[in-house]
Amino acid sequence: MENPDDRYLWKTDKEEFFPKLTVYELAIGFFRFLIFVSYTLCSIPLFLLAKILFNQTGIKKPMVIIRRYWSLVTLRLCSLKIKVKGTFSSEVCLVVCNHISWLDILAIQSIADVVFVAKSDVKNWPGLGFLAKLANTLFVERNPQKIGLHSEQANVILSNGNSVCFFPEGTSSDGLRVLKFRSGFFQLAFNSLGEKKVNIIDIQPLSIFYEPKNSDMRIDFYGWWGNMSLFLHILKVLCKSSGIVSLNFHKLLKSDRFQNRKQLASKAEDIIRDELTFNIEKSRIR
């Protein structure tokens, strides 16, 4: 029997859904794109200047503010409103989230100051790769021999007082399901961190859900998976998008109450899946 999750493993040949776009929608999309490019080109020098002036002093607020407003403006250009439930932890933690599309980064970044973990392929994406590097993203390779190196890099980030956000599904989906969590990176919750010997980092599950508002948009409209074209997905979001992205910051999971990373990963997965199921059912009732 075919595994229904196989279509999210970046090897599907199924044709992706792409809505018909009117001339008006194409014009709107092009206008939004021009604003995005202009705003981004203005934001990059400001961000780099803030980085030069404040990076050595340990003051992060100017960079965080610039990054946050850039993300919020970009979300609004995509006609997405953001709704937040819960509170991002003020303690250093590992944030784990279900993954739906490239929009997740913008939504999370508009609220939380975190360092993202991304697959190494992302740094080669035109435009987006450069922006990811600028944000100090930790790029990881899917190579078992590199796990030790990547864990060490993440430990340094955590020991410097930065929370780390990663997507344990290992890929993105249609937003209507949560794929099986990979437990590898959860080991960071139990690792020793530098000279301070802080050996417990708590986990904050974060569930994300997109709710389209246009009646002609499918409920999986924002999902980007398999070998879908990144360009076409960005195009349809800019031209036709209208909806809400909901972020739910759940209570911290105390890592010292779990025996190992697999138990911790399983609990985080259950919390996020339950929240996603609730949101899907609620949106269908309306």
Regions found by a protein language model. Name each.
Residues T137-S163:
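A membrane-cytosol interface segment of integral membrane proteins
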Residues F47-L53, T57-M63, L77, C93-Q145, ...:
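Catalytic core of membrane glycerolipid acyltransferases/transacylases, capturing the structured
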Residues M1-F18, W70, L77, K81-K85, ...:
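Soluble, non-transmembrane catalytic domains of enzymes that act on hydrophobic metabolites at membranes
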Residues G127-G129, N143, G175-Q259:
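A cross-family acyltransferase "interaction/gating" segment
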Residues A154-N155, N162-V164, P168-R177, F181:
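Soluble extracytoplasmic domains of inner/organellar membrane proteins
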